[in-house]
């Protein structure tokens, strides 16, 4: 069924909550393990209609944040979502109280029971009103960001549409693009500062109600992190600071030499090559045709997947006024259909987001068709889910010539370099958020000062050259995740560590790398991050010294593939 044929009906929340109570009672009373397993499948399916409606509403809202009907529907889910989540938690609580609960681990793997425990520990009826307030705060941020229109080159442009100007070979054009963006954020400075303060206050209040010191502690439960905690993440960040950042300084020196920009400033960083960055082929149809060929040749599984996605028009990837920034993949369970949202802006990032979101969607497509996988275990934890997407970016490399033509080698270098450099920025975002939630009384200026300190730690090569907004340390405010889903961002770093290993493996044996990836994908959400890495034969980055060798291999490859 094509996307525009999918019908939306606002769900009956009362009926759903009553059904949840019934399922919780059944779970508590299940007489044996077989009955409990059957009931787990039943409760997992019970939310399919609600989740389909919620995701349809969110797709339509983010595609046009100005549409009053879909804004009202999004408000409905913002208001009612916490009650539904809490009802789901009560079902988990009932499963955990059943003496046969260990059967679920035997059937569904280590994440099932551990995930239910996290769900119980992460939710509380006393926080429902605070959760509703948080959802409203996020919607306000999305409206500020999604409604951004700036004047440049005689045009009204969205933030994503500034992308090509930021990569222009004329430094004055680049500076003007960044200043136009900065002007918009500076104009909303007071509101953005106030919003973030309210978000920190809100989430810390939720944490304290539930007995946690602050939200940085609660987040590990809410993010369903299984098998590791704050100490492992701190060790990971330390390894990046000590073993990756020094290598990145070499990489940035190579970039400066390659571009001929002797003393690059922040607005020069998007320039990767003297003659301009790689450009993908133009045109929606041409790109989609290339994607179909690419996925048909990659594997039978991806061929079936891309046909389903394109034939059912499950993409909205072109930027336009009123459309929310960013990119995502979501699922429509009633139709067993993934959906991909993006904002193409005629830069190489268009291919990044296409292959990235297709990685998410491919895993969802495979899991939805495996009858052994319950609906709520189709996707693993977020740090693992990002492996599917980031690794797909690299594993499609043999076909990138279809999308870049003569710029293919430039894109290969840019993509590998950007992914490697990203590790530092991702750790910076994570450490910043830990500081913010552990020090909630910081003033807006003090928050910005902390960000600038972390810039020196993780990205010491950056010179902001008195650029408005960024130069005062407020650049973090354009990072959607910091407002919308705190503490998510480190997941991109953990998955990047897996993706870089897939990249290095593919250089010597692409077929083997793909088969390892498929094994990982087929475990769906029924294995933890460390188990998934072990399934694919990859190193776990929490172990001391595990990153150093990978960082050296990446630097060596980048040094020998300068274009």
Question: Where are each of the predicted segments found?
Answer:
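A well-structured
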Residues: 1-278
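C-terminal, non-catalytic "cap/extension" segments appended to globular domains
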Residues: 115-117, 227, 318, 354, ...
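Glycine- and acidic
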Residues: 122-123, 179-188, 228-234, 269-280, ...
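Long, well-ordered alpha-helical segments
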Residues: 196-213, 251-255, 359-369, 390-407
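Inter-helical turn/loop segments and adjacent helix faces that build the functional surface
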Residues: 230-231, 254, 258, 298-301, ...
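Post-HExxH zinc-binding segment in Zn-dependent metallohydrolases
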Residues: 242-243, 367-368, 379-407, 415-416, ...
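Auxiliary, metal-adjacent structural segments of Zn-dependent hydrolase domains
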Residues: 274-334, 347-348
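Active-site recognition of the HExxH zinc-binding catalytic motif
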Residues: 342-368, 389-390, 394, 432, ...
């Amino acid at each position: 069924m094509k996307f525009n044929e999918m019908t939306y009906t606002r769900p009956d929340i009362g009926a759903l909550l009553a059904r949840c109570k019934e399922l919780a009672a059944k779970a508590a009373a299940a007489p044996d393990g077989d009955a409990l397993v059957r009931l787990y499948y039943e409760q997992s399916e019970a939310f399919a209609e609600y989740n389909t409606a919620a995701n349809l509403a969110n797709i339509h809202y983010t595609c046009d944040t100005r549409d009053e009907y879909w804004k009202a529907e999004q408000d409905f889910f913002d208001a009612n979502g916490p009650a539904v989540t809490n009802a789901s938690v009560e079902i988990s609580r009932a499963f955990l109280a059943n003496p046969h609960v260990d059967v679920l681990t035997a059937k569904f793997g280590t994440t099932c029971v551990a995930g239910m425990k996290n769900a119980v520990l992460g939710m509380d009826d006393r926080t429902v009103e605070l959760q509703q307030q948080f959802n409203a705060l996020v919607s306000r941020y999305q409206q500020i960001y999604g409604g951004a229109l700036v004047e440049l080159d005689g045009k009204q442009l969205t933030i994503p549409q500034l992308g090509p100007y930021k990569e222009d070979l004329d430094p004055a054009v680049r500076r003007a693009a960044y200043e136009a963006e900065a002007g918009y954020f500076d104009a909303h400075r007071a509101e953005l500062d106030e919003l973030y303060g309210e978000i920190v206050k809100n989430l810390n209040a939720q944490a304290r109600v539930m007995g946690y010191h602050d939200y940085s502690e609660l987040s590990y439960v809410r993010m369903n992190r299984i098998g590791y905690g704050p100490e492992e993440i701190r060790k990971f960040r330390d390894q990046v600071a000590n073993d990756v950042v020094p290598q990145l300084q070499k990489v940035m020196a190579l970039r400066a030499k390659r571009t001929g920009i002797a003393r690059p400033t922040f607005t020069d960083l998007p320039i990767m090559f003297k003659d301009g960055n790689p450009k993908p082929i133009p045109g929606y149809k041409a790109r989609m045709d290339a994607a179909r060929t690419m996925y048909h040749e990659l594997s039978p599984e991806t061929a079936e997947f891309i046909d389903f996605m394109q034939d059912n028009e499950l993409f909205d990837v072109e930027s336009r006024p009123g459309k929310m920034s960013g990119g995502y993949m979501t699922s429509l369970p009633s139709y067993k259909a993934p959906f991909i949202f993006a904002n193409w802006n005629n830069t190489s990032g268009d291919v990044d987001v296409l292959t990235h979101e297709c990685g998410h969607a491919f895993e969802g497509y495979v899991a939805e068709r495996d009858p052994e996988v319950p609906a709520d275990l189709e996707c693993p934890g977020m740090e693992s889910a990002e492996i599917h997407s980031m690794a797909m970016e690299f594993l499609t490399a043999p076909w990138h010539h279809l999308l870049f033509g003569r710029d293919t080698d430039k894109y290969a270098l840019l993509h590998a370099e950007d992914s490697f450099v990203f590790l530092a920025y991702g750790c910076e975002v994570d450490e910043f958020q830990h500081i913010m939630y552990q020090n909630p009384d910081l003033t807006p200026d003090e928050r910005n000062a902390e960000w600038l300190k972390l810039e020196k730690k993780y990205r010491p090569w950056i010179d902001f050259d008195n650029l408005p907004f960024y130069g005062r340390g407020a650049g973090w405010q354009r990072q959607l995740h910091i407002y919308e889903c705190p503490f998510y961002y480190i997941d991109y770093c953990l998955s990047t560590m897996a993706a870089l290993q897939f990249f290095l493996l593919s250089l010597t044996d692409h077929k083997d790398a793909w088969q390892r990836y498929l094994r990982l994908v087929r475990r769906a959400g029924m294995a933890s991050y460390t188990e998934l890495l072990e399934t694919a034969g990859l190193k776990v980055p929490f172990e001391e010294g595990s990153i150093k060798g990978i960082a050296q291999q990446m630097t060596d490859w980048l040094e020998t593939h300068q274009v």
